[in-house]
Amino acid sequence: GGSGGGTYGSYWGTSTGAGTSGQGYAGGHGSDGYYVYTVGGGGGGAGGAGQSTNNTTPPRGGYGLSSTITGTAVGRAGGGGAYSNGQSAWSSSSDGGSSNGDADVNKGGGSSGNGNAGSGVVILRMLTSDYSGTTTGSPTVSTSGSDTILTFNGSGSYTG
């Protein structure tokens, strides 16, 4: 993804990961030296920057973006919630990871601590009259009104 990671500690002097323009936002700053705990900054999300902290509270990851391509609103690509060596973390508000936990699968969200980021997803939506039916892999095929929706959670292709 194009989002930046948060810093771990060193609130006043460490650069955060920068987001890629049009893809994601920067991570937040963490803190250390002021308190007993060292706290990371929240990871950037597709819809907003990761939060920073100057105390012992682990900040949230940046917001993801809501996608309605499948007909139902789903948050995707949220930044990972920050980790503290003394407290549990907050998660992103839109499918980011929490402390030492895994992000939601097939939503592309970030993680925190020792967790795994969410796997990606590719969604294609087209008029059913244009759908060729030629695919590889195992996409989920659904319809919504006059449209056909292909959801790839793994390897595959579509030929139109």
What are these regions (language model features)?
Residues 1-160:
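Low-complexity, glycine/proline-biased repetitive segments and flexible coils/loops
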